[in-house]
Amino acid sequence: MASPRKEGNTAVLTKVLCSELDRLNEEFTYYHLYDMNIDGCIACRRCQQDWSGFNCFKNDDMQQIAEDILDSDIILFATPIYSWYCTPPLKAVMDRLVYGMNKYYGETKGPAIWAGKMLAAVTTCGYPPEKGSDIFEEGLERYCRHSCLEFAGMITEHHKGYNTVFMDSQKAEHIKEFVQKLYK
């Protein structure tokens, strides 16, 4: 989860998502990215020399995230949309993954070691989704094509203003239906 606010709108939706995964007896690992040490990618390409895994030389929390992704079937990103894209910690994760998981950038072009996995996203934004999160969704679609991942969709819930209540039963139902669609 890539929200700086642990009780914010994205966090509330993520709690519903996790509850639904529990109800469906799906195993998952939850990360709050703002609590983690994740450096940005520097495009050094050292990870390209070894195709056996993620293999970034940086000694931070990204190695564990990458290992868990390699052991998973579905990758779920949850982020508020700030300035039409994900928050900085998720962008750092995405940049590190695109190099470490896609062995395309070395002396010899290698495989996408995470090919075939599904990727989906849950987002919140202060604009209608077609004007607030559409650019991020397009970015995820391209990211998935490039990485040989299956883009399984994105759900965006709109917050209509700071003086309004965000969460309601309709939003909770949307998240539950989204999770059920992913895991059927």
Where do the model's predicted regions map?
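N-terminal beta1-alpha1-beta2 submodule of the flavodoxin-like/Rossmannoid cofactor-binding fold
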Residues: 1-79, 83-102, 106, 160-184
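Short, glycine-/small-residue-rich phosphate/pyrophosphate-handling segment
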Residues: 105-152
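Beta-strand-loop-alpha "switch" segments that mediate conformational coupling across diverse proteins
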Residues: 153-158
